[in-house]
Swiss-Prot record:
Keyword match Nucleus: yes
UniProt gene name: STYX
BP-aspect Gene Ontology terms: negative regulation of protein binding; negative regulation of SCF-dependent proteasomal ubiquitin-dependent catabolic process; regulation of ERK1 and ERK2 cascade
Lineage summary: Eukaryota, Metazoa, Chordata, Craniata, Vertebrata
Region Disordered, residue ranges: 197-223
Tyrosine-protein phosphatase domain mapped to chain residues: 28-176
Top-level division of the source organism's lineage: Eukaryota
A GO molecular-function descriptor: pseudophosphatase activity
Designated name of the protein: Serine/threonine/tyrosine-interacting protein
Record's subcellular location: Nucleus; Cytoplasm, Cytosol
Any single Pfam family the record assigns to this protein: DSPc
Family: Belongs to the protein-tyrosine phosphatase family. Non-receptor class subfamily.
């Protein structure tokens, strides 16, 4: 594939007056990026409507599994726009397939001047993984750097091992996707041609090796 230089925006730096983390803060939401918040379901309950409105929340991503639907609910569908994802906090759950739609949802909100809250149940594993993935793709970051950035703002995050593995894999996936999006049709065609030519060369090499091996066997038999 031809070299395509990807450019990413600068990552906002941590506020100098950032509040020191205390245990009770895990039950509240924190602003990870300007306009992007991460928290537990308790930060999106009916009793927290004044807090949500105070922070200017307009969009909410609610992450839950089916058995949690009885108590984790989109409580303000008349006031906020919701994206509800049915995802279990299970290491074998495929979360990569949901990353594109969540990025589109968050980008759409921020571009129109809105603010987004991403929450699961505890705001530690599932929702944290999605915020990390968003930061990775938006700012061109590796998993470990995006994790550290989010943890500076919400110290209690701890995506399960399966989610961590998928986030580490996602780096190559989003870079390849963005590279293809940046390439012109001619560049893509050239890259495919180069790849095809390389494959053909390898095939010819293997065929030549097979022919040479056959000749050696025939010579040995005749000798």
């Amino acid at each position: 594939m031809e070299d395509v230089k990807l450019e990413f925006p600068s990552l906002p730096q941590c506020k100098e007056d950032a509040e020191e983390w205390t245990y009770p803060m895990r039950r509240e939401m924190q602003e990870i990026l300007p306009g992007l918040f991460l928290g537990p379901y308790s930060s999106a309950m009916k009793s927290k409507l004044p807090v949500l409105q105070k922070h200017g929340i307009t969009h909410i991503i609610c992450i839950r599994q089916n058995i949690e639907a009885n108590f984790i609910k989109p409580n303000f569908q008349q006031l906020f726009r919701y994206l509800v994802l049915d995802i279990a906090d299970n290491p074998v759950e495929n979360i990569i397939r949901f990353f594109p739609m969540t990025k589109e949802f968050i980008d759409g909100s921020l571009q129109m001047g809105g603010k987004v809250l991403v929450h699961g149940n505890a705001g530690i594993s599932r929702s944290a993984a999605f915020v990390i993935a968003y930061i990775m793709e938006t700012f061109g970051m590796k998993y470990r750097d995006a994790f550290a950035y989010v943890q500076e703002r919400r110290f209690c995050i701890n995506p399960n091992a399966g989610f961590v593995h998928q986030l580490q894999e996602y780096e190559a996936i989003y870079l390849a996707k963005l590279t293809i999006q940046m390439m012109s049709p001619l560049q893509i065609e050239r890259s495919l041609s180069v790849h095809s030519g390389t494959t053909g060369s390898l095939k010819r090499t293997h065929e030549e090796e097979d022919d040479f091996g056959t000749m050696q066997v025939a010579t040995a038999q005749n000798g």
